[in-house]
Amino acid sequence: MPNQNLIALGFDFGMKRIGVAVGQTVTHSANAIAILKAQDGVPDWEKIKMLIETWHANVLVVGIPYNMDGSEQTLTFAARKFARKLQTRFGLPVSMVDERLTTIEAKRQWYEQGLTKRPQHLDNYAAKLILEQWLQEQKNE
């Protein structure tokens, strides 16, 4: 998808919460925008549809969790299933990104900003990092 101005929504999938970020390929920047509740990994599809329409997203990016050794875990399969359902429901291209260490990096950035209160949820910050990684890959193509 090089040489296109794309607006992307990035997702940090979880069984209870799904972090969402928005970014675009013109500036290769992303912003955390929402944390959606999920019930056993099932999101509120209408809220996702609303975010896609509000931001005029034309590509979706899902973080896929792996163990540090690269092996897969239960959540790996659930995140892939979520990515497939996004593609089927909304007919948009979906990219998957290795999301190892994004939550740790999100915490580091949180405290680096001088925010001392422990964050309750970092899912949307993790989604931002996932999306920034994808945007960097697009820039390098």
From Swiss-Prot:
Xref: Gene3D superfamilies: YqgF/RNase H-like domain
GO molecular function: nuclease activity
An example Gene Ontology CC term for this record: cytosol
Locations listed in the record: Cytoplasm
UniProt KW Nuclease keyword: yes
InterPro entries assigned: RNaseH-like_sf (IPR012337), YqgF (IPR005227), YqgF/RNaseH-like_dom (IPR006641), YqgF/RNaseH-like_dom_sf (IPR037027)
Keyword check for Magnesium: no
Name listed for the protein in its UniProt record: Putative pre-16S rRNA nuclease
Native organism: Coxiella burnetii (strain Dugway 5J108-111)
